[in-house]
From Swiss-Prot:
<dbReference type="Pfam" id="PF17384">
    <property type="entry name" value="DUF150_C"/>
</dbReference>
<comment type="similarity">
    <text>Belongs to the RimP family.</text>
</comment>
<keyword id="KW-0690">Ribosome biogenesis</keyword>
<feature type="compositionally biased region" description="Acidic residues">
    <location>
        <begin position="191"/>
        <end position="205"/>
    </location>
</feature>
<dbReference type="InterPro" id="IPR028989">
    <property type="entry name" value="RimP_N"/>
</dbReference>
<dbReference type="InterPro" id="IPR036847">
    <property type="entry name" value="RimP_C_sf"/>
</dbReference>
<dbReference type="GO" id="GO:0005829">
    <property type="term" value="C:cytosol"/>
</dbReference>
<comment type="function">
    <text>Required for maturation of 30S ribosomal subunits.</text>
</comment>
<keyword id="KW-0963">Cytoplasm</keyword>
<feature type="compositionally biased region" description="Low complexity">
    <location>
        <begin position="224"/>
        <end position="236"/>
    </location>
</feature>
<dbReference type="GO" id="GO:0006412">
    <property type="term" value="P:translation"/>
</dbReference>
<dbReference type="InterPro" id="IPR028998">
    <property type="entry name" value="RimP_C"/>
</dbReference>
<dbReference type="Pfam" id="PF02576">
    <property type="entry name" value="RimP_N"/>
</dbReference>
<dbReference type="GO" id="GO:0000028">
    <property type="term" value="P:ribosomal small subunit assembly"/>
</dbReference>
<protein>
    <recommendedName>
        <fullName>Ribosome maturation factor RimP</fullName>
    </recommendedName>
</protein>
<feature type="region of interest" description="Disordered">
    <location>
        <begin position="182"/>
        <end position="257"/>
    </location>
</feature>
<dbReference type="InterPro" id="IPR035956">
    <property type="entry name" value="RimP_N_sf"/>
</dbReference>
Length: 257
């Protein structure tokens, strides 16, 4: 699927934030457009106290390290003046990443043919969560088809999802998606690849913690050194997962006024 999709700064998002995140989005969306960037998402978290996570990109979907720093420098004083958070916070600016949110019609068009998770509100025919392969949105940008795997007999395998009811959507991380993302954006730097390996290890550890396995019985006695005592990590045969481009700033309460 070609990545040459027409998109511009004026294209509205289908998904909007609420509460403090909405106030942050309102404060920065216009200035971002003035710099040639589009806001993807604002999310608040309790990481390191309070963290404001901002995803942005250019209309063509790219976002370099220089872009990230430029956005961080531009919106930091704006948030200082408007003070939508109302306290000290950490500011993180990043690219959308590979398993990115889909927030505009052009996002669905650009990533047609790839797997995604979509949530609707209100539900469609009693169902609000869908996972499958995206098709291209209809010419009016009203609906997007999704092909569902393993559908029960008698039920449709393709459903047209109304984008006006979109609550949340994001791509599903697959080897195919990683390869295509690398093709479009270029390979990551060496340090980014190392960070990606660490993130991948954390994901594996989290999965293991959620589904613990019983350890095999080990007889008591002196421990013998053995090259097979510690299982070796299997080499990844596919492309490495690049990390998102990110810049962070700490905003102390005393510096907000």
């Amino acid at each position: 699927m070609s990545s040459e999709i027409e998109a511009d700064l004026s294209e509205k998002r289908l998904v909007r934030e609420a509460g403090v995140a909405a106030r942050v989005a309102q404060a920065i969306e216009g200035p971002l457009a003035g710099l040639g960037f589009r806001l993807v998402r604002v999310r608040m978290s309790n990481v390191n106290g309070c963290t404001v996570q901002i995803m942005a990109e250019r209309p063509d979907g790219t976002f370099t390290i220089d872009d990230c720093e430029a956005v961080s420098r531009a919106i930091s004083p704006i948030l200082d003046v408007d003070d939508p958070v109302g306290g000290a916070y950490n500011l993180e600016v990043s690219s959308p990443g590979i398993d990115r949110p889909l927030v505009r019609v052009s996002d669905f068009a650009r990533w047609a043919g790839y797997e995604a998770k979509v949530e609707l509100s209100p539900p469609l025919d009693g169902r609000k969560r869908f996972r499958g392969i995206l098709g291209a949105p209809d010419p009016t940008g009203t609906t997007v088809p999704i092909d569902l795997p393993d559908v029960k007999e008698g039920l449709p395998s393709r459903i047209d999802l109304p984008l006006k009811d979109l609550a949340e959507a994001h791509l599903v991380l697959t080897d195919e998606l990683i390869r295509e993302s690398l093709r479009r954006g270029g390979p990551p730097a060496a340090d980014e690849a190392d960070e990606a390996e660490e993130a991948e290890d954390e994901e594996v550890a989290a999965e293991s913690a959620s589904s613990p396995a019983r350890a095999p019985f080990q007889p008591k006695g002196p421990r013998k050194a053995s090259p097979a005592a510690k299982p070796q990590k299997q080499a990844r045969t596919g492309p490495k997962k690049p990390v998102v481009t990110k810049a962070s700033r700490l905003k102390d309460r005393d510096s907000l006024h």
